Amino acid sequence: MKHRLFLLATLGLLLVLAACVAPAPPSVATSAGGESSAAAAQPAVVEAPAGPTGSLMVALSLEPNSINPPNGADRMAGNVINQIFDSLMSIDNSSGEIVPALATAWEVAADGSLYTFTLRQGVTFHDGSAFNAQDVVATFAAGKDPANAYASAYDPVVAVVDDYTVTIAPVTPDVTFLRRMAETRIISDEQFAAEGNAGIESHPIGTGPFQFVQWNKGDRIVLQANPNYWDAGKPHLAEVIFRPISESSTRLAAIQTGEVHIVNRLNSDEAASLTGAGQVQVITYPADRVYYIAFNNLTTGVGLPTENKLVRQAMNHAVDRQAIVDGLFNGHARLSSGFVTPSNLGFDESLAPFAYDPDKARALLSEAGFPDGFSIGMACPVGAYTNFEEVCQAIANYLAEVGITMEGGEVQFLESGVYWDKEAAKELPPLFGDSWSASVGEALPRLNGALDGMNASYSSWSDPEIDAMLNQIAQTFDNEARAALYKELQAYMLDNPPFIYLYEPISFEAINSAVQGYVPNSVEQYELKDVSLNQ
């Protein structure tokens, strides 16, 4: 019982501390459609200056693994990439609608098999070269490099019609394709031809609102305003500096002292300590991000007890996720029942999360043929997510209570960059922790990313039934019919869990009151071309 007693004592202490120091959190603003919206919490808008001015300091919760678009493995990498590179279209932060960017118009074949894009003319890259159709071709050619984290996302076939028209054909019809394209950042054909992906990695050249200056590893990434940006009057900032600060408490101190202007992934106690601070505003919203412990049946988990669905059900029942959420997040998270969240199309609110029931867990293990439990390896990243190391340790302790112990006696904790590389190479242990967001408004990319077998870099599981359901969802363009398919999938994945489902967090960000025009979103994605500083 020592693991259980230790964990409960630890969580009890955290709850006592939370009750002592944490006032009620800032309210969450939610739009009529159910999407989280923190826009109402912004400072009053002031008119931006005529030309770029001011230096915005942004804290990152971890060092990006890469700033080459197809290789950026995490949201922090993406937040730097998004300022340097543009995509063919964008998602409007306020409305959630698809809007033109490097493409001014597009047509979609009735069966979703072909997309034709009309490209914006007069756009230049940061080195002065002209943007045209060849750059779209180069983007997909560069992305296909198997060394990239998201190589499988670049499978579609691109063809040039003329200098400012391209067609893109997905391998199979995909209802989320246009929204995925809003995440596909366009690189320079000239740079790729001359320098390859290595050149893009060391000094990326895009068409975005900010251009790359330098990256001092462990210290800062410096960007400066693109003076020839195609979106007239933007950006408003002269400079953006990203500061990787892995320790949450250090990020808190940095926003308190004015060293940085924006921080995210604060915990609830840290956010509460900022409430009422004169120059700092706290914004909170439900994140469209699911945390989980993956089961691996592709490589390291082959032939292990976790291939038995009763074992996987048992492990879900073994973990008291509510105690973890209460103890480590002051209750500011929703327990997950699957990979479709309340803001996603087709969410089934009738499906309850696995109940904490260690006796049922033991009974299921016995029924599966493992009455004495077993030993298994588990890994988690360090510094990637709020309190995640503590979450992983708590899970290991709960599993030990039903006889499932860690190989080597402990969870393997790895630096996040090393961790993502091992995850992409399918070299992590049979259990590993991670999270997925879904920036397209529904869960399909998240589901594909984690469950597409050996085809996707960060997937861990393959199930022919799930594969068939996902293929059907991707090819169903009627929203009502697709929502029904999502519900079928959720029920199947609850009975045949490919993960230990954990939680969907409430996100806490803090911004300096001088920051104007900043609109957070549910996937923690920064778009800074509209931001200015009131100095």
List the predicted regions and their residue ranges.
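A bilobed periplasmic-binding-protein/Venus flytrap-type ligand-binding module shared by bacterial periplasmic
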Residues: Q224-N228, A287-A314, G327, P505
